[in-house]
Amino acid sequence: MSRVCQVTGKRPAVGNNRSHAMNATKRRFLPNLHTHRFWVESEKRFVTLRLTAKGMRIIDKKGIDAVLADIRARGEKI
């Protein structure tokens, strides 16, 4: 499974670790992903999404039905 939020589209970013001597080594900044199951009343079923903490806040604000409509409009299968 890829490390991509299904709501926000956030992906891993690449940057540097910096030591005290300012030596740079490559590293990845991973998104704060969680697998979360939501009850969708309109479909009478659970939907499992892999999303970040910010994605959960967006669902709290807009509602699961609106977010699912956005995801399906992008062509993702849920």
Curated annotation (Swiss-Prot):
Keywords: Ribonucleoprotein, Ribosomal protein. One of its GO terms (biological process) is translation. GO terms for cellular component: cytosolic large ribosomal subunit. One of its GO terms (molecular function) is structural constituent of ribosome. SUPFAM superfamilies: L28p-like. Belongs to the bacterial ribosomal protein bL28 family. PANTHER family: 39S RIBOSOMAL PROTEIN L28, MITOCHONDRIAL, LARGE RIBOSOMAL SUBUNIT PROTEIN BL28M. This is Large ribosomal subunit protein bL28. It comes from Pasteurella multocida (strain Pm70). The lineage of its organism: Bacteria, Pseudomonadati, Pseudomonadota, Gammaproteobacteria, Pasteurellales.
